[in-house]
């Protein structure tokens, strides 16, 4: 199991949001400095979200993210505003290890297969953002049916992995809800990475025992509620 420190980028800065709300942003400085700090503390992978992309500017921060990939040299998964095959291709060609396809995957699931056949399924991750058991899309503003049903469909279409985010608890640092995670893992055979609510060693141990492939650490890491050292120790 891997721990992915989050590097969420908005306006060229590393930020953390609460519940995905732009107005809740707390600024943590230069994204590359944040990324470098996590690597120095033992991270071997990063979860990079282009929030400007999620808020409508698809190629915002491209040069910065390319630099981050080049300078860090570690595994990077990237999401945020990938709304077309052209967007996906542009980001894959920056050298990120995999891209996270969210709303686009629910609108055009066949895109997952198209991209997987071109770049390999391992580089295509489908985002399963769930609210009240439903998949949440369009910046979590709309829901479109049972999240497990969508997850199995994404796997059938060619996604090589899934990013499960529990929108109900994301950014609140209140702990993970394991039941939906376990339900999802039972339904699919591809790796599942979990985001949302991960805020203690116990959360990470629970996820590890449930069989997840990775966990994203965001708000709890930046606020100091958990250290990266504690997180890495919890999954040994």
Curated annotation (Swiss-Prot):
<keyword id="KW-0028">Amino-acid biosynthesis</keyword>
<dbReference type="InterPro" id="IPR013785">
    <property type="entry name" value="Aldolase_TIM"/>
</dbReference>
<dbReference type="InterPro" id="IPR011060">
    <property type="entry name" value="RibuloseP-bd_barrel"/>
</dbReference>
<keyword id="KW-0368">Histidine biosynthesis</keyword>
<dbReference type="InterPro" id="IPR006062">
    <property type="entry name" value="His_biosynth"/>
</dbReference>
<dbReference type="GO" id="GO:0005737">
    <property type="term" value="C:cytoplasm"/>
</dbReference>
<dbReference type="InterPro" id="IPR044524">
    <property type="entry name" value="Isoase_HisA-like"/>
</dbReference>
<feature type="active site" description="Proton donor">
    <location>
        <position position="129"/>
    </location>
</feature>
<comment type="similarity">
    <text>Belongs to the HisA/HisF family.</text>
</comment>
<dbReference type="GO" id="GO:0003949">
    <property type="term" value="F:1-(5-phosphoribosyl)-5-[(5-phosphoribosylamino)methylideneamino]imidazole-4-carboxamide isomerase activity"/>
</dbReference>
<dbReference type="InterPro" id="IPR023016">
    <property type="entry name" value="Isoase_HisA-like_bact"/>
</dbReference>
<protein>
    <recommendedName>
        <fullName>1-(5-phosphoribosyl)-5-[(5-phosphoribosylamino)methylideneamino] imidazole-4-carboxamide isomerase</fullName>
        <ecNumber>5.3.1.16</ecNumber>
    </recommendedName>
</protein>
<dbReference type="GO" id="GO:0000105">
    <property type="term" value="P:L-histidine biosynthetic process"/>
</dbReference>
<comment type="pathway">
    <text>Amino-acid biosynthesis; L-histidine biosynthesis; L-histidine from 5-phospho-alpha-D-ribose 1-diphosphate: step 4/9.</text>
</comment>
<feature type="active site" description="Proton acceptor">
    <location>
        <position position="8"/>
    </location>
</feature>
<keyword id="KW-0413">Isomerase</keyword>
<dbReference type="Pfam" id="PF00977">
    <property type="entry name" value="His_biosynth"/>
</dbReference>
<dbReference type="GO" id="GO:0000162">
    <property type="term" value="P:L-tryptophan biosynthetic process"/>
</dbReference>
<keyword id="KW-0963">Cytoplasm</keyword>
């Amino acid at each position: 199991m891997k721990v992915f420190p989050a590097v969420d980028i908005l306006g060229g800065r590393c930020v953390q949001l609460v519940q995905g709300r732009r107005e809740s942003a707390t600024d943590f400085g230069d994204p590359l400095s944040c990324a470098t700090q996590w690597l120095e503390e033992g991270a071997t992978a990063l979860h990079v979200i282009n929030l400007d992309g999620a808020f409508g500017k698809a190629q915002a921060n491209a040069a910065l993210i390319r630099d981050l990939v080049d300078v860090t040299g570690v595994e990077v998964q990237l999401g945020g505003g990938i709304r077309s095959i052209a967007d996906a291709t542009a980001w894959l060609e920056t050298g990120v290890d995999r891209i996270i396809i969210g709303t686009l995957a629910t609108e055009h699931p066949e895109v997952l297969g198209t991209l997987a056949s071109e770049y390999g399924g391992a580089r295509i991750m489908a985002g399963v953002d769930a609210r009240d058991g439903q998949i949440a899309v369009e910046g979590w503003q709309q829901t479109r049916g049972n999240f497990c049903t969508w997850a199995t469909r994404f796997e059938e279409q060619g996604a090589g992995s899934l990013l499960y985010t529990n929108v109900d608890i994301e950014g609140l640092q209140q702990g993970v809800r394991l039941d939906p995670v376990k339900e999802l893992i039972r339904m699919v055979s591809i790796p599942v990475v979990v985001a949302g609510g991960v805020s203690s060693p116990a959360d990470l141990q629970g996820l590890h025992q449930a069989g997840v492939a990775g966990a994203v650490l965001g708000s709890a890491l930046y606020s100091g509620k958990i250290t990266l050292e504690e997180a890495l120790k919890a999954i040994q």
